[in-house]
């Protein structure tokens, strides 16, 4: 929550 890191 907070930063959005697009990880599969």
Curated annotation (Swiss-Prot):
<keyword id="KW-0027">Amidation</keyword>
<keyword id="KW-0964">Secreted</keyword>
<keyword id="KW-0527">Neuropeptide</keyword>
<dbReference type="GO" id="GO:0007218">
    <property type="term" value="P:neuropeptide signaling pathway"/>
</dbReference>
<comment type="similarity">
    <text>Belongs to the pyrokinin family.</text>
</comment>
<comment type="function">
    <text>Mediates visceral muscle contractile activity (myotropic activity).</text>
</comment>
<feature type="modified residue" description="Leucine amide">
    <location>
        <position position="8"/>
    </location>
</feature>
<dbReference type="GO" id="GO:0005576">
    <property type="term" value="C:extracellular region"/>
</dbReference>
<protein>
    <recommendedName>
        <fullName>Locustamyotropin-2</fullName>
    </recommendedName>
</protein>
């Amino acid at each position: 929550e907070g930063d959005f890191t697009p990880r599969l």
